[in-house]
Amino acid sequence: MGTQYFGIQQQLNDGIRGLHLNITQGATASDVSLCYPDCNAYNGGSLRDTLTIVKNWLDTNQRDVVTIFLESALLKASPAAVLKAFADSGADKYVLMGKPAAAWPSLESMIGNHTTLVVFSDDAGLVAANPKGYFIPHPNTVLRLDGPFTYGAEWTCGPWNRRYESILVIPHYIVQTATYNGATYNNMPYPFNLGTTNGYQFEFHAITCRGGQSIWINFMEVDYYSEGDVKTPTLKLNALPYPNDNVANFYPQFFDATVEVVG
């Protein structure tokens, strides 16, 4: 069962800039599949095909930055197969090479250098096996807060002590135990009550957890982003205007907004 109702192309067109991809060994040693939690429950196709979509999208959207979080399954894909998927898709030409030793580059410099694809991996073996250094180690860089949650549970914001992480990720989605194709799985998507989960609770969770951390929010992880309204609070968190908004709407209304002609 997928965690979104739309494919990668539509997600990017809709403004999604962070992609969480669960990778596992494919049918052959040179293949990498996107499955969650395994390919019996859900098979989302090949990593190469998804990376090709991302690469083609970046070709025509050169002022956008996309981030991919690679999460390895129990049956880990071989590092050589993952590298091959990046090379065969052409996505490797956009990848930011490794975590900067000091500060992260500005978005403007990344755009200018055409390094607009950032890739994190939780697999130390994959990070070590990559001679080009474009898989950034997830545990050393990303502070991922508590989650996921079950329905009715309180949103929490630990851990509270940042060590050296510079990227803040807040998981905001609900999971359940469910049976697919005769097998029972934990931490499966919960596609219910999304108007609430992806509505006011999204903004409440973000603001509450931001107040207890020393770094700004970089990513909110959500399932079924197209349900509810995560766009409006995301614009607010980024201090961006709403669609079709106008700066004149923020002027103080001391007088009627009319102009009289004097002859």
Segments the model singles out, each with a brief description of its role:
Residues 1-262:
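Catalytic cores of phosphodiester-bond hydrolases, prominently lipid phosphodiesterases
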